[in-house]
Amino acid sequence: MAEAIGLAASIVGIASAGVSVVSTLTKFGISFRGSNDKIDSLAGRVSLTASILSVIATTVEQNASGFKKEEFWRTWRKVLSSCEESYGKLEKALLKARKSGTSKGKGGTDGVSVWGKLVWALGGETEMQDLERSLDSCCQQVTMMHHAVELSVLSLIAQRYTLNFTFIKFAMLIR
């Protein structure tokens, strides 16, 4: 049981990192002459993934007896690590892009759109496309993880129901 609670806490930590990135991304988009559709879309993707991770963490915690940390990590470690890595890259780029807002002259980004600043901070259009693909993949895989966790919970419920039903039938037979 403590294993599953620790697992849930780890997932919450990754979800919190996503929420933090969304907050920073939203503030960044607003701070440079209003919001930008591409920034909003990126924030929406990260927000959705972080929300699903939070739901997974809650489900795992509420059904702790059915989840073994080792098995769960073996199956989903890459997905969670990928999300965490993508959030980290985005957070780092946002910090760099925010600092660039005050720079002038050579290497500065004055007069560049919000999206352009973020692309510049990531290292270029190719890196931005890679990050977007990674975030999309995280969202899809976290959605699959959510479905797998929900199926596990349904399986646990079915096992409990079957055991209870078998016990009731047995109790009726011995009367």
Identify the residue ranges that each predicted region occupies.
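DHp/HisKA dimerization-phosphoacceptor four-helix bundle of two-component histidine kinases
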Residues: 37, 41-44, 78, 85, ...
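A structural signal for well-ordered alpha-helices, especially hydrophobic packing surfaces
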Residues: 50-53, 57, 80, 84-94, ...
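Charged, acidic
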Residues: 62-128
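Regulatory helix-to-disordered linker/tail regions at the edges of structured cores
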Residues: 105-175
